[in-house]
């Protein structure tokens, strides 16, 4: 049998796999177990009561977390004219049309989010095979195809997270860094769950948010008792 690492032994000792923890206790555990040599992210997995095989039960969207994600986000915007100037003023690192598309085709991908105005989709559409697999393709549902590109840039910079359930009906995203205050992580999680509840498909029946687990980049998942979250009230 393979020998457990020191961190794995600590996780096994501290985390009860079948227990749902008070949110404050769960965050305290994550902080105690975050022993990596870099600043770990705090990630969340939300099991939804949906059938992901049915298109009318898939959940996709975006929300701005009140305390951001702790990441510096580089934004590329496809637009022109006055919108281009507005995007630059809002903080976008890359703004353009055909010349920006050429950079991407050449393999220059120095950005984390792509935003486009509707009139630019004729250019962006040709980049689907490059941006799509990386989860970067702009989409109206996530607010990344919009006539108000400046607002979208500000949202991305402010800590907007995009979410989409996977083939198992689970949402995976980040809610901050391990050095965030416990209250900040709690409020970010509550904001995400609130957004998910608003995005509940009409076709989804029964319990919608079935399980919530938080973890650090290198750590094990800790199940959260939803009753200890303000959003549950």
UniProtKB/Swiss-Prot annotation:
Highest taxon, organism lineage: Bacteria
Gene Ontology annotations of biological process type: regulation of translation; translation
GO molecular function: rRNA binding; structural constituent of ribosome; tRNA binding
Keyword RNA-binding: yes
Keyword terms of this UniProt record: Repressor, Ribonucleoprotein, Ribosomal protein, RNA-binding, rRNA-binding, Translation regulation, tRNA-binding
CDD domains: Ribosomal_L1
GO cellular component, one term: cytosolic large ribosomal subunit
Family per similarity comment: Belongs to the universal ribosomal protein uL1 family.
Quaternary structure and partners: Part of the 50S ribosomal subunit.
Stated role: Binds directly to 23S rRNA. The L1 stalk is quite mobile in the ribosome, and is involved in E site tRNA release.
Designated name of the protein: Large ribosomal subunit protein uL1
Organism ancestry: Bacteria, Pseudomonadati, Pseudomonadota, Gammaproteobacteria, Alteromonadales
Gene responsible for this protein: rplA
């Amino acid at each position: 049998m393979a020998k457990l690492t020191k961190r794995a032994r600590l996780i096994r000792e501290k985390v009860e796999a079948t227990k749902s923890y008070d949110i404050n206790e769960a965050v305290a555990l994550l902080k105690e177990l975050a022993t990596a040599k870099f600043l770990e992210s705090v990630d969340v997995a939300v099991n939804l009561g949906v059938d992901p095989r049915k298109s009318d039960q898939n959940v996709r969207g975006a929300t701005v977390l009140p305390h951001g994600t702790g990441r510096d986000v580089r934004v590329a915007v496809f637009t022109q004219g006055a919108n281009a100037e507005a995007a630059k003023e809002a903080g976008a690192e890359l703004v353009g049309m055909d010349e920006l598309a050429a950079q991407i085709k050449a393999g220059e991908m120095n950005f984390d989010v792509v935003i486009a105005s509707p009139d630019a989709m004729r250019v962006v559409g040709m980049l689907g095979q490059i941006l799509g697999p990386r989860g970067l393709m702009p989409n109206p549902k996530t607010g990344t195809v919009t006539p108000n590109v400046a607002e979208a840039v500000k949202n991305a910079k402010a800590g907007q997270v995009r979410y989409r359930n996977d083939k198992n009906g689970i949402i995976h995203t980040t809610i901050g860094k391990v050095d965030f205050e416990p209250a900040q992580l709690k409020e970010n999680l509550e904001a995400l769950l609130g957004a998910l509840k608003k995005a509940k498909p009409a076709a989804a029946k029964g319990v919608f948010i079935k399980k919530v687990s938080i973890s650090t980049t290198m750590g094990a998942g800790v199940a959260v008792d939803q009753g200890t979250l303000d959003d549950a009230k």
